[in-house]
């Protein structure tokens, strides 16, 4: 199966996966890449809409 479709299925079948992904984006990525909190939502929304 295509990994992208598997990833999409995770969102549909495991709603908590969205919460864990959000926690990951907020807490772990800023520590490694110095991304501002305000930059996370535009990036995340653009990535979902692709």
From Swiss-Prot:
Its main subcellular localisation, reduced to a broad class, is plastid
Per the record, membrane topology reads:
Single-pass membrane protein
- Spell out the subcellular localization from the entry: Plastid, Chloroplast membrane
Q: Give me the segments passing through the membrane.
A: 10-29
Q: Which GO terms describe its cellular component?
A: chloroplast membrane
What UniProt keywords are attached to this protein's entry?
Chloroplast, Membrane, Plastid, Transmembrane, Transmembrane helix
Q: From the Swiss-Prot or TrEMBL record, give the protein name.
A: Uncharacterized 6.4 kDa protein in atpA-psbA intergenic region
Q: Which organism is it from?
A: Marchantia polymorpha
């Amino acid at each position: 199966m295509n990994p992208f479709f598997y990833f999409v299925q995770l969102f549909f079948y495991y709603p908590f996966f969205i919460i864990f992904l959000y926690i990951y984006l907020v807490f772990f990525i800023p520590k490694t890449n110095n991304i501002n909190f305000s930059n996370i939502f535009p990036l995340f929304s653009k990535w979902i809409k692709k």
